């Protein structure tokens, strides 16, 4: 079982997948236009789902743009200026330790 997030320009969609790949939960919320708020929302949703399921789960996040291997920053994120030049991956790893 795992939790996945799809961060877009207008929404954050969360899903819980069973080990078989079967979807057991899906929810869509508005995406805030501020980096720290996006991180906070994902952490909050994850905690809510883990409490509901009574277990800690792996979390995956996809978002527009690419990670620069040289800098670790996000670049080329169309319509998502609030995550441009941010260290999304490093920040998430700190939140989920």
PLM segments and residue spans:
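Feature marks short, surface-exposed loop/turn motifs that line or immediately flank catalytic pockets
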Residues: 11, 65-69
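Glycine-rich phosphate-binding loop and adjoining helix at the ATP-binding site
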Residues: 58, 68-97
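Short coil-to-beta-strand
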Residues: 17-18, 59-61
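Short beta-strand segments
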Residues: 6, 60-64
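N-terminal, well-ordered alpha-helical segments
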Residues: 40-47, 86, 90
């Amino acid at each position: 079982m795992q939790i996945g997030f799809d961060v877009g320009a207008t929404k954050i969609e969360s899903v819980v997948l069973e080990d078989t790949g079967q979807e057991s939960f899906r929810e869509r919320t508005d995406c805030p236009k501020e980096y720290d708020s996006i991180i906070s929302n994902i952490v909050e949703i994850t905690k809510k789902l883990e409490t509901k399921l009574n277990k800690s789960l792996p979390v995956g996040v996809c978002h527009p743009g690419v990670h620069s291997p040289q800098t670790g920053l996000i670049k080329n994120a169309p319509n998502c200026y609030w995550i441009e030049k941010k260290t999304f991956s490093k920040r998430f790893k700190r939140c989920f330790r």
